[in-house]
C-alpha cells in the first residue's frame, strides 16, 4: 500500500518491491498530485488519525467521481476463471537447497489492495517503503477485475481478489523458543494461526497440502501489525512462491535473516468453498459485460462487435469559421470510427443541405430522413439548435423511426443536464473521451438491448427487451405501488436526510455555512422508483441520466457493494430564466447544482444538491464531501429492514390483475361469429365488416367522442354465461370457458397446466381471470378486493397489459417483472412485443396532437383563454389497433389453428392534467378506456 500523495500519472499506487531488507531512511519528495488529495473534501478528516474514504483516490481532476464496488458474490462471479489459479512460481526442495522454478507459461500478475483506509496508520508505523521503483508501462500495477488491459480508466475503481502485504520477519525469534517444543514457523515468524482440518489429519492428505486460511492472528505479530491481514484471508504465496500447508514451513525456514517479505493473500470475501459448483455461467458472462460496459473498459470490444452495422452520431455546424475550405471543418464530433459509419459520414453534406433547404422552403425543421447503406435502410434523426445540428443514424430493422426520434431527444436532454448545453458538450476537446463512452453505451442499448437486460427468468428478460422500445423513452420513471405504511417509512427516511439538521450537516456544528443545500432526493429499488421528493422536471432528467448510463438495470440485476457517483449537473428547470415579471415571484438563486448517487445492494439513492443561495458558494471543481456521502449511505443502511417488505410487494403484484392471452384462444368458427358483434366495433360509426384474413389483421379507427357512445352491450365473445356446462366439465377456480374450449380443441398443453398450477399458489386473490362457481364461495371482503384489483368489468378479467403515464409527476405504472413472468405462453410473449411497438406508434400520434394544440394555444393573443378553450373542446384523444393472432408452430394439419383478437388502445387526457393510458385487452371486453383510466389513476400519489 502506498501513500496517495505518491502516485503515477494514472492515479495508481506503485507496486511494492519484493525485497526491502535494506531500507533507506531518506524521505523522498512528495509529489502532491492535485488530483485526489484536493478534490474530495472531507471535513471530518482533519486530524492525522482519521482514515481516508476508499473512494477518495478515484476522484478526477474535474471533481467527478464514479466509484463502483460490487457485493462479494457479484465480484466473485465476475472474476475470470484464469485468475482463480495462483499463477506464481513453484518451489521444489532438494536435500541442501531450494530450487525455485518460474512458470513461463503464464505471467504472474501483481495484485495490490484497492482500499487505502490504513494509509496514515501504516505510514506512522514506518511500514510503508520509502522508495518506490516505478515499473515499465507493460506492468500496470493493480489489475482491476473489470479491466484486462494495460490502460486503466481514470475514476473507476473496484475491489481486488488478491492483495500483497509486506511484513518484517526476523528468524532470530526462534532462539527464544528453542527450549520449548518446536512451534510452527507460520505463527512465530508471520503471526498467522492456521488450524489444519480434522479431515485432513485423519485421511493423511499430504500430496498438495491444503489452503492456508487465516484462522487467527498472534497478538503483536507481524501480520497484526500490518493491519491488512484479516481472519478468513488465504495465504497463497511468499515472495511469489506459492505455498500450502505442505511446504509453508520449509519455505519460511529458508529465510536467511531479518528482512521484509512480501506475502500474497486472497481476500476473505473472495474465498469460496471448493465444492461450490459454477452456476449461471452465461448470466455471469453477460453481467460481466454489463459492468465492463458501464465502467468504459469494453468500448473497443463493443465497437468491434458492431463494425458491420451502420450507425453514427455527428454534431455538425452550419456556419463555417473561415473562408478557406478545410476538410471536415463542419464536423465538430462523430462516433464511432468504422467502415460502416464512414459511409454515413461521407454523405453528411446531404443532411446539411436537407436541414437548411427544407427549413427555408417549408418553414419547418426537418426531423428525420431515411437512406439505404449496404442494402440496409438507415433512419437518421435531426435535432437543430441555433447553427448546430445533431444527427443520429441507426438501422431501421433495429430501431423504429418514432423510437429514434425519442432517443435523440433524450440524448440532447441528458447532455444538457450533464454539460449545460450541446455546445459545451461537443465543442470542448477534453469531453471527447467522455462522449465516446456515453455514445458507446447509447449504441449498445440500441443495437444489443438484450445484453443489458439480464434477468433470472427468460420471460423477464424478453419482457425487458420488448418493453425498452416504449418505456426507455417515456418522460418518467417506473413507479412501484407500495402500501401506505411502507411509503411513510421511506418518506420519513428521505425527509431526515433532506432536513440536514443533525451532527456535521448542521450549521451549528462547525459554526459556518453548510456546503450544500439538499433540494430533494429519489429512492430506487431494482430499477423502480419507490419514493421521491423531487419535482417532476428533476425526476425526469435524473432518470434519463440513470438510463443512459445503465444504472437502473445494474441495480436491478446485481447486489451493489457500494456505488458513488458525483458530478456537477445543470438542471434546466432551475437554470432557465424566469418568465414571470412579478418581483414578488420566486426567483431561483444563482448557484451550482451537483448530483450525488449512492448505491447499496439493490437500492439507489439520487440526491440533488445546491451550492449557493442558502449554502456556501462553490469554487473550482469541488469533489464529493465525505459527510454527505456517509449520510446518504447511512440512509440506505437504515432501510435494510424494509427491503424484504418491498420484495414481498413486488411478488404480490400490486397493480391490476392480468390474464394470459393463451387462455383466450377460441375456435375459428366461434371467432368468426363474434367478430361482427365486437363491443368495441359496435360503438364505432360504420365499422368495417369485411371478413377476417387468416393472418394478423389490424383495424385502425379514428378519434371518437365519449359522449356519443351507446350503452355498453353485454359480453358476447365468451359464447356462454358463467357457470354454463359446469355439470359436465369440472371447472377449477383457475379455468374459464375460453380455456375449456381451447383445451377441448387442442387437447391442452403442458405450459397451460404449469401456468394454472402457478396461479393456484397465489392465495391472496382467488384468480384474476375468472371466478366461476368459486365466486359464490368468496367472502364479501375478498370479493371487494378482487373487484378493486380487476381493471375491467364483467365476470372475466380480460386485461392483458397496460402502461399508465402520469406526466405531471413524471412516473409511469406498468406490470412488474414478476407479474409478466407468471403469464407464460408463446402468444402472450408476442402480444407483449406487439403492444409496446403499437403504443410507440400511437404515442407518436399523440405527440403530434400535443404540438398542434400548443401551436393553437400560442397563436391566440390571450394565452389562458385559448388553452382553456382548446382543452374544453378536445378533452381526450383516443387511438387503437385491433390484432388477430394464432399460435406459432401449429402442428395439427387437420384442424385450423385457433384465433384470438385483442385491442391495443391508447388514450390521451389533456384536462385536468396531461395523462396517457395504454391498455391491451381481449376483443370481447365492453370497457372503455376512460373508465379503466379512472380506476388506475384514482388515488395515485407520490
UniProtKB/Swiss-Prot annotation:
Region ranges (Disordered): 1-54, 129-150, 707-752
Keywords associated with the record: Cell projection, Cilium biogenesis/degradation, Cytoplasm, Cytoskeleton, Developmental protein, Phosphoprotein
Superkingdom assignment: Eukaryota
SUPFAM superfamilies: PDZ domain-like
Ranges annotated as biased composition (Basic and acidic residues): 1-13
Compositional bias ranges of the Low complexity kind: 33-48
Subcellular location: Cytoplasm; Cell surface; Cytoplasm, Cytoskeleton, Cilium basal body; Cytoplasm, Cytoskeleton, Microtubule organizing center, Centrosome, Centriole
The protein's role, per its UniProt record: Plays a key role in ciliogenesis and embryonic development. Regulator of cilia formation by controlling the organization of the apical actin cytoskeleton and the positioning of the basal bodies at the apical cell surface, which in turn is essential for the normal orientation of elongating ciliary microtubules. Plays a key role in definition of cell polarity via its role in ciliogenesis but not via conversion extension. Has an indirect effect on hedgehog signaling.
Protein name listed in UniProt: Protein inturned
Organism: Rattus norvegicus (Rat)
Lineage, broadest ranks: Eukaryota, Metazoa, Chordata, Craniata, Vertebrata
Protein's gene: Intu
